[in-house]
Amino acid sequence: MAKKIAGQLKLQVAAGAANPSPPIGPALGQRGINIMEFCKAFNAASQEMEKGSPIPVVITYYQDKSFTFVMKTPPVTYFLKKAANLKSGSKTPGKASAGTISRDKVRTIAEAKMKDLNAADIEAAMRMIEGSARSMGLEVVG
């Protein structure tokens, strides 16, 4: 018989930096999930990823207090800020430009995010990434 799901929890955790301190510890603890077990499993699974990059993770926890988790790719905004060497986007997107990004870099980001995006092909994924870039005040050139 399959385990009964008690719920799901979505967190964004830095790769290789899961520890029992807030906000991870309290979020897991109040649901009865073993905090250290999650931290060790997450850090081991995120070992291959760039240290410190924000990783969205969906934790499914069961009534017997066990859990499974699925890691996604970092958010598009993280990739865009990294590609354009920015600390943050424009305060007034559409009016003030925060910088520029090439279509080649947009394609690279789209290829990295393809499995998490709801897009049929790479061109559709690129349009989604370009929309996010415009929302941040980035200008897509080339």
From Swiss-Prot:
Molecular-function annotations in GO: large ribosomal subunit rRNA binding; structural constituent of ribosome
Keyword Lyase: no
Pfam families found in the cross-reference section: Ribosomal_L11 (PF00298), Ribosomal_L11_N (PF03946)
Family annotation (CDD domains): Ribosomal_L11
Keyword Ribonucleoprotein in record: yes
GO cellular component, one term: cytosolic large ribosomal subunit
InterPro entries associated with the record: Ribosomal_uL11, Ribosomal_uL11_bac-typ, Ribosomal_uL11_C, Ribosomal_uL11_C_sf, Ribosomal_uL11_CS, Ribosomal_uL11_N, Ribosomal_uL11_N_sf
Post-translational modification: One or more lysine residues are methylated.
PROSITE patterns: RIBOSOMAL_L11
Sorted UniProt keywords: Methylation, Ribonucleoprotein, Ribosomal protein, RNA-binding, rRNA-binding
Signal peptide, first to last residue: none
Job of this protein: Forms part of the ribosomal stalk which helps the ribosome interact with GTP-bound translation factors.
Assembly and oligomerization: Part of the ribosomal stalk of the 50S ribosomal subunit. Interacts with L10 and the large rRNA to form the base of the stalk. L10 forms an elongated spine to which L12 dimers bind in a sequential fashion forming a multimeric L10(L12)X complex.
Family: Belongs to the universal ribosomal protein uL11 family.
Record-given protein name: Large ribosomal subunit protein uL11
Underlying gene: rplK
